[in-house]
Amino acid sequence: MLAEGYEIRPLAVGDGPALAMAYRCNREHLAPWDPTRPEAFYTAEAQSVEVADRLRVVAAGQGGSWVLVRDGEVAGRVNLNNVIRGVLQSASVGYWVGADHTGRGLATAMVEHALTEAATLGLHRVEAGTLLANEPSQRVLVKAGFERIGIASEFLFIAGKWQDHVLFQRVLHHRPLESTRAGRR
């Protein structure tokens, strides 16, 4: 259930400026969990380019992107990334919630929304990773039905260094893979 006044909607062409503002406002809040970003990342122009790139991925059926909005401002974001078809039928999920919006179940709602969309795309599983110390994000994943599957050493370059991550997965269904789907995608 989404907290009152919030909406999760698909990323849209005009979202670049609002995303840039959200990233600027949450720069310190997100810094421990994000890659080191160049200054240009925080501009409306850079975010508009990123939005256009993501929308191409979405249009190709290779991912999904949604924003959490309150009062017309971006309060968070969730993406389905790295869609792999064939015999894997998998994707990864990434998400963040702005500092002023934490503790309301919003991250869990966004992840659950992405899982519903992943099922619509016909995916079998979704994976996620968190830094070892990011216990709030680990709780989000467990609440959304993910299971912990292990530790990946030096998994991602976050906050200026290679960092270990706890890996999670959520299996969406146990149906057999349609051979025509595996061959086409």
For the regions a language model picked out, list residue spans one by one.
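GNAT-family acyltransferases
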Residues: 1-92, 98-100, 162-163, 167-185
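Conserved beta-strand edge residues that scaffold enzyme active sites
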Residues: 37, 132-133, 155
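Conserved G/P- and acidic residue-centered "switch" motifs that form tight phosphate/ATP-binding loops
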Residues: 72, 105, 122, 134, ...
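Conserved acetyl-CoA-binding loop-helix of GNAT-fold acetyltransferases
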Residues: 95-97, 103-116, 120, 135-143
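Conserved GNAT acetyl-CoA-binding A-motif
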Residues: 120-130
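Conserved catalytic-core motifs of GNAT/GCN5-like acyltransferases
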Residues: 129, 147-164
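Conserved active-site tyrosine of GNAT-family acetyltransferases
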Residues: 141, 146, 168
